[in-house]
Amino acid sequence: MNIIDRFEQENISKRTANKKIPDFEAGDTVKVTVKIIDRSIEKDGKEKLTERFQAYEGVVIAKRNRGITSSFLVRKISHGEGVERRFMTYSPMVHSIDVVKYGVVRRAKLYYLRNRSGKSARIKERHIPIAKTKAAKA
């Protein structure tokens, strides 16, 4: 293992020490909670920073596993428009990742969903035995 790989592994272990990243793949519906920092200027001219959390729920259409720069692309329909957002898996701005539903797909990248709407864009749900999910949570 070279120096860069070792550095990346140390960095990943530091960032995942206090948060759990579940196993998910393309086709799964996830809920990503992101930390947003708002900057506002008060009347006396002082700058005020406020933190809040925003949830983003959608279908994972692509996943990129590249060490510390791993990311995944989530697509959702908001007010009739398709919205895609890429999240860095190990970013400190990503507060939590929760899997809502597991999907059954036969592709690693689901870019074809961009051209589909309605029933043709649905993904079958994969049912996981209860014992397996309880063991994963423990």
From Swiss-Prot:
Coiled coil: none annotated. Keywords: Ribonucleoprotein, Ribosomal protein. The keyword Cell membrane does not apply. SUPFAM superfamilies: Translation proteins SH3-like domain. Pfam families: Ribosomal_L19 (PF01245). It comes from the Bacteria. GO terms for cellular component: cytosolic large ribosomal subunit. The keyword Ubl conjugation does not apply. GO terms for molecular function: structural constituent of ribosome. GO terms for biological process: translation. PROSITE patterns: RIBOSOMAL_L19. HAMAP family: Ribosomal_bL19 (MF_00402). NCBIfam families: rplS_bact. Belongs to the bacterial ribosomal protein bL19 family. This protein is located at the 30S-50S ribosomal subunit interface and may play a role in the structure and function of the aminoacyl-tRNA binding site. This is Large ribosomal subunit protein bL19. It comes from Rickettsia conorii (strain ATCC VR-613 / Malish 7).
